[in-house]
Amino acid sequence: MIEADRIVTASSRDRDEQLDRAIRPLKLAEYIGQPVVREQMDLFIRAAKGRQEALDHTLIFGPPGLGKTTLANIIAEEMGVSIKSTSGPVLERPGDLAALLTNLEAGDVLFVDEIHRLSPIVEEVLYPAMEDFQLDIMIGEGPAARSIKLDLPPFTLVGATTRAGMLTNPLRDRFGIVQRLEFYSTEDLATIVRRSAGILGLPTEPEGAFEIARRARGTPRIANRLLRRVRDFAQVRGKGEITRQIADLALNMLDVDERGFDHQDRRLLLTLIEKFDGGPVGIDSLAAAISEERHTIEDVLEPYLIQQGYIMRTPRGRVVTRHAYLHFGLNLPKRMNEPPTPDLFEGDIV
């Protein structure tokens, strides 16, 4: 299974990029959801503009598809500066980073996606650039090599990552602003769907937008992708308007159920229930049972199911919860109906 083939994947697709840019908000006032992040960034941006300074270096982290790139572009737009974008894997050599840094104007934003994937040698060059706005460059080779320092204009580095824990401490400590993006509520996603539909000129009833939103796994990127597919269905099999019924029929045809699960999610859960009596089962046995690679289960299938409380990782292996049985309308096994074992140490003072 290739993750990019799943309609409910939160990973970015090249074919989504053009449409995503067309519906991407450019101002904080248009940015839906993430109220704490929005309020804080509004304050920080206003303060920096009032002092006529570059915004502090900003780290944005959270699951894929929640709007890290969008927020980086909004920061540049609100600050009234240009943004140059790259990603960690692209910056292979110090020269790659130096070329970007030396072309920045005062106050500009340098956006580095997947910043946790920077190579150590590039990261070392980035430290003085972030802290002192200086670039150390080695000229020549061997005994004749010498280091020269170039002054850089004050700039803002905006780093984005889905794995903040993989950042080195020295790099993490150089960010003055750190923002975590959370999964979106269904109500906020419905607002995003209605906004995107309006930009696309697509008549959409509130109930239709809500039906799409509740199956979007808390992720705007998925919500917008589902909207485009429901638009196709409404155009061919409906009257061009997205109603709750049209959205329901379209998403059922796409095999996305009311919890946002697709065939792969349901197959994993049912395998645990039917072949392993709900678990626990080791990851390698589970991978063999559904003919998938271990890393596919760990990195692609499990995270959302764990986040929603349908699977637990235990020292003995994977276990489904009562939510999985109820989702499929199955009777709970006897062990799930038994009262919990009393804590032998309950009441003891520790």
From Swiss-Prot:
Residues 258-350 are annotated as: Head domain (RuvB-H). It is an enzyme of class 3 (hydrolase). It holds the Pfam family RuvB_C. GO terms for biological process: DNA recombination; DNA repair. ATP binds at residues 23-24, 65, 68-70, 131-133, 174, 184, 221. It catalyses: ATP + H2O = ADP + phosphate + H(+). Mg(2+) binds at residue 69. InterPro entries: AAA+_ATPase, AAA_lid_4, DNA_helicase_Holl-junc_RuvB, P-loop_NTPase, RuvB-like_N, RuvB_C, WH-like_DNA-bd_sf, WH_DNA-bd_sf. One of its GO terms (molecular function) is ATP hydrolysis activity. Residues 185-255 are annotated as: Small ATPAse domain (RuvB-S). Its EC number is 3.6.4.-. Keywords: ATP-binding, Cytoplasm, DNA damage, DNA recombination, DNA repair, DNA-binding, Hydrolase, Nucleotide-binding. It is found in: Cytoplasm. Residues 4-184 are annotated as: Large ATPase domain (RuvB-L). DNA binds at residues 294, 313, 318. The keyword Hydrolase applies. One of its GO terms (cellular component) is cytoplasm. Belongs to the RuvB family. Has 3 domains, the large (RuvB-L) and small ATPase (RuvB-S) domains and the C-terminal head (RuvB-H) domain. The head domain binds DNA, while the ATPase domains jointly bind ATP, ADP or are empty depending on the state of the subunit in the translocation cycle. During a single DNA translocation step the structure of each domain remains the same, but their relative positions change. The RuvA-RuvB-RuvC complex processes Holliday junction (HJ) DNA during genetic recombination and DNA repair, while the RuvA-RuvB complex plays an important role in the rescue of blocked DNA replication forks via replication fork reversal (RFR). RuvA specifically binds to HJ cruciform DNA, conferring on it an open structure. The RuvB hexamer acts as an ATP-dependent pump, pulling dsDNA into and through the RuvAB complex. RuvB forms 2 homohexamers on either side of HJ DNA bound by 1 or 2 RuvA tetramers; 4 subunits per hexamer contact DNA at a time. Homohexamer. Forms an RuvA(8)-RuvB(12)-Holliday junction (HJ) complex. HJ DNA is sandwiched between 2 RuvA tetramers; dsDNA enters through RuvA and exits via RuvB. An RuvB hexamer assembles on each DNA strand where it exits the tetramer. Each RuvB hexamer is contacted by two RuvA subunits (via domain III) on 2 adjacent RuvB subunits; this complex drives branch migration. In the full resolvosome a probable DNA-RuvA(4)-RuvB(12)-RuvC(2) complex forms which resolves the HJ. This is Holliday junction branch migration complex subunit RuvB. It comes from Stutzerimonas stutzeri (strain A1501) (Pseudomonas stutzeri). The gene is ruvB.
